[in-house]
Amino acid sequence: MEIYIFLYSSRFNTSGRFYFAGVHNIIPLHGKGIASSNDFDLNKYDLIVARKRNYYVTNIKNHYCRAHSEGDLNILRSIVEAMYPDYNQAFDTVMHGRKISLYNMFVGKADVVNQYCQWLFPLLDEVNKQIDFSGYDSYQKRILGFMAERLFNVWIEHNKRNIKVGYRKVVNIEGENLIKKGSALLVRHFLK
């Protein structure tokens, strides 16, 4: 069995196929290459994830702290340390690195996805109990999702010897203003 997890506006890209496989039909999406279930080879990979984004001017930890609460990230780190101390090295490797798979989206073998979910959700549940969301706007209230993106990479880093991971390009079906995103990143990094 295969399990597919996708963000609401992002899909995996494919080369050569330009459709989104709907429940009963094929929906053209203005020439964007949207992968369908036939485009994923889980005989070759255990997990297929978004191609890593490279943060050239900062590392993953600093990027997170400039956009969100450093205190919340410290809470997350302490929870990982308490619940899964064997993941500490992977956590630090990801946070001090410059590449990350984003979007909380993947296609994977059911047993691998189950292992990940059994690890992830107790962590997020504990984080949810310890963080005070009362002063957060609607964007910052999404921090569990932002943390899950980082934790996904931590889980992969820790398990990389036991699973085969494939990487795919992602297309945002709503469009993505990369100049605006890049400018905001630079402002947060250099002016905050």
Question: What is the predicted function of each stretch?
Answer:
Residues M1-K192:
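ER/Golgi luminal nucleotide-sugar-dependent glycosyltransferases, focusing on the catalytic module
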